């Protein structure tokens, strides 16, 4: 089985900014939409608990960035920017700061875009190498947030928050997701069709981070250095970057694959995940038990 966020399997799921092209500006109140209606007409490309309001889950989609009110179950698009948002990632030290990539509605690639106001407005930071890039995988280093990784024609790295980029190395075969370390600026994790890998040499040399060669549909590193990954046949696992055994948090999601994972930075026991079935699951015990959002 070939697993990729671009595959048919997953298709149902994929600070002042200075001078730049502003893609959109917020224009006040917008219509609210039940989560079920939003998910029926789009698919998810990323999740983040709002660092400015932990009562909201931010959902990057094929049609812009939306905020889910966790009390009401209603969503609202945060700006007029309704383009396909790939590689969505929250800044680990600047609440309200985000990076994304993807495709504009008119076609082509976005390059790297950024928001510093919670997603209300976006500015283009860079075309990347051989761009405009379309980073389907992107992550900000928790060890040094000025370092950003992306994958487009190989792994690219920025050392200045996404403004300039260099081509670093070929991506591992069958790459599905990447996650930057919270311990070392040189360390990068790769979820692939043949297992979970780690490089401590700026993506130039790779070793297995988990012994199985089963597909891994996502990998995420928390600010405290805890790695989370979903491994086919094993479920949701976690382990500290500093070592120790892998802990199986939840083995059986029936026919679901977890594509994206977000934990509340204030309360890490509260977590959210998106599946290939186009649904959002929520946990209040650090990932040991899950329920579909809105079914309480």
Question: Each PLM stretch: what is its role?
Answer:
Residues 1-19, 23:
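N-terminal secretory signal peptides and thylakoid transit peptides that target proteins
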Residues 34-35, 63-82, 109-127, 156-168, ...:
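Asp-box/BNR beta-propeller loop motif
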Residues 36-66:
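Beta-strand-rich domains and repeat architectures in extracellular enzymes and scaffolds
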Residues 51-53, 92-95, 142-144, 182-184, ...:
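Residue-level detector of Asp-centered blade-edge/turn motifs that repeat once per structural unit
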Residues 81-86, 129-133, 171-176, 212-217, ...:
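Short coil/turn segments at the loop-to-beta-strand junctions that recur within blades
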Residues 104-109, 150, 231:
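Short, solvent-exposed loop/turn segments at conserved positions within beta-propeller repeat blades
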């Amino acid at each position: 089985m070939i697993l990729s966020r671009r595959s048919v399997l997953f298709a149902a799921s994929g600070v002042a900014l200075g001078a730049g092209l502003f893609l959109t500006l917020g224009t006040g109140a917008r219509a609210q939409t039940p989560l079920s209606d939003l998910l029926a007409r789009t698919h998810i490309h990323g999740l983040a608990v709002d660092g400015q309001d932990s009562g909201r889950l931010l959902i990057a989609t094929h049609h812009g960035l939306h905020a889910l009110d966790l009390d009401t179950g209603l969503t609202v698009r945060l700006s007029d920017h309704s383009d396909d948002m790939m590689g969505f990632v929250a800044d680990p030290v600047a609440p309200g700061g985000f990076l994304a990539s993807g495709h504009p509605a008119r076609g082509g690639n976005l390059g790297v875009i950024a928001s510093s106001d919670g997603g209300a407005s976006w500015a283009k930071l860079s075309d990347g190498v051989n761009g405009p890039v379309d980073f389907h995988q992107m992550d900000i280093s928790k060890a040094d947030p000025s370092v950003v990784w992306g994958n487009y024609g190989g792994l690219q790295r920025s050392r200045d928050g996404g403004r300039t980029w260099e081509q670093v190395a070929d991506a591992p075969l069958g790459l599905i997701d990447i996650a930057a370390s919270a311990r070392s600026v040189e360390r990068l994790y790769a979820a692939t069709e043949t297992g979970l890998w780690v490089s401590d040499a700026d993506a130039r040399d790779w070793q297995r981070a988990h012994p199985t060669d089963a597909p891994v549909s996502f990998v995420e590193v928390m600010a405290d250095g805890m790695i989370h990954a979903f491994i086919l046949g094993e479920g949701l696992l976690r382990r500290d970057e500093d070592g120790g055994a892998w802990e199986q948090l939840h083995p059986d999601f029936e026919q679901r694959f977890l594509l994206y994972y977000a934990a509340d930075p204030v309360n890490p026991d509260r977590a959210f995940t998106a599946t290939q079935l186009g649904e959002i699951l929520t946990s209040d015990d650090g990932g040991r038990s899950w329920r579909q959002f809105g079914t309480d």
